[in-house]
């Protein structure tokens, strides 16, 4: 049987740079990698099924968008392969309604929200003008289980009619009706941050919600602006979800409260800034990959002891 340290399945063309960096950094440490794409998924699935091929770790950036990768995911879940972001934990973590309640229980600040059931379960919900007045206007409408890139999210809603219309659009999904959170300004910058949890370590960056541009957050800035709580909040979310790798968005508002506004994104957009103006700073991408490398080395070492 051929055994590789890490297999990565992906279908999005813009993942290529991220995957290339992973291969380069891991192979420099004599860690073997295996890439799975649409052209070889059937062959790989067959070889894994027949136990001719095996992986110690698996990153799946494909089966959520391409059913051809689902069988391999099922097989590897039954083997000793360590799945980066266990599927069961992902399903729990991407449910915004569940995360909203669990974050509150963990002491995290979240936007005031109203959770409403799927249209397929309850056609009519009782929402009043008074409910909207508490939310404020505009407010945000979010499907609870539709994830990635703001899909299905309405950020400038004003009326009950918009809520009712959106419920029909995704009739099997719960919805969060959420107050809009506004960041304070820190020396001319919006205090909006995207934070990664990357294999045991938090990484925080500036992220402008209007321009979608990243900037590295320096240690001096973190100290001067009192932003170390970003790392603590991200660590708390990691404990709640049990995921290995995800991103979240946290806002510092004008009451000096850190508010988690976009709960968990398990499929992080890892386009690099040197090639994409709205990409993740290259240094941060390298840091995340080095965290992955160290996680694999540490886990292999522990398994060899056991």
What are these regions (language model features)?
Residues 11-122, 127:
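Conserved N-proximal alpha/beta basic substrate-recognition cap immediately N-terminal to
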Residues 2-9:
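Extreme N-terminal starter segment of soluble prokaryotic enzymes
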Residues 103-104, 129-151, 172-187:
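ATP-grasp fold ATP-binding core
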Residues 139, 176, 203-204, 246, ...:
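Protein kinase-like catalytic core scaffold
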Residues 112, 139-165:
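Glycine-rich phosphate-binding loop of ATP-grasp-fold ATP-dependent ligases
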Residues 153-241:
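Phosphate-binding site of ATP-dependent enzymes
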Residues 252-306:
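C-terminal active-site "lid" helix and adjoining low-complexity regulatory extension at the edge
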């Amino acid at each position: 049987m051929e055994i590789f340290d890490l297999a990565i399945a992906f279908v999005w063309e813009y993942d290529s740079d991220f995957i290339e960096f992973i291969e380069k950094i891991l192979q420099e440490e004599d860690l073997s990698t295996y890439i799975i794409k649409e052209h070889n998924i059937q062959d790989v699935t067959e070889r894994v099924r027949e136990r001719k091929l095996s992986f110690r770790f698996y990153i799946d950036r494909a089966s959520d968008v391409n059913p051809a990768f689902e069988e391999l995911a099922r097989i590897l879940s039954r083997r000793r392969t360590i799945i980066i972001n266990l599927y069961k934990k992902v399903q729990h973590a991407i449910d915004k309604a569940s995360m909203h309640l669990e974050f509150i229980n963990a002491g995290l600040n979240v936007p005031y929200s109203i959770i409403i059931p799927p249209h397929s379960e309850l056609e009519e919900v009782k929402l009043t003008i008074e409910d909207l007045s508490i939310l404020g206007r505009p407010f945000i409408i979010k499907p609870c289980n539709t994830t990635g890139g703001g899909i299905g999210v309405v950020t400038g809603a004003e009326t009950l009619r918009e809520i009712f219309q959106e419920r029909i659009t995704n009739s099997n999904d719960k919805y969060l009706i959420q107050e809009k959170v506004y960041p304070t300004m820190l020396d001319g910058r919006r205090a909006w941050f995207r934070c990664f949890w990357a294999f045991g370590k938090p990484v925080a960056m500036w992220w402008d919600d209007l321009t979608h541009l990243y900037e590295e957050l320096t240690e001096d800035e973190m100290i001067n602006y009192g932003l170390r709580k970003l790392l603590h909040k991200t660590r708390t979310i990691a404990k709640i979800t049990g995921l290995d790798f995800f991103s979240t968005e946290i806002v510092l508002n004008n009451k000096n409260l850190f508010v988690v506004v976009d709960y968990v994104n398990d499929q992080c957009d890892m386009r690099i800034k040197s090639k994409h103006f709205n990409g993740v700073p290259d240094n941060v991408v390298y840091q995340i990959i080095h965290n992955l490398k160290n996680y694999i080395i540490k886990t292999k070492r522990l398994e060899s002891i056991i």
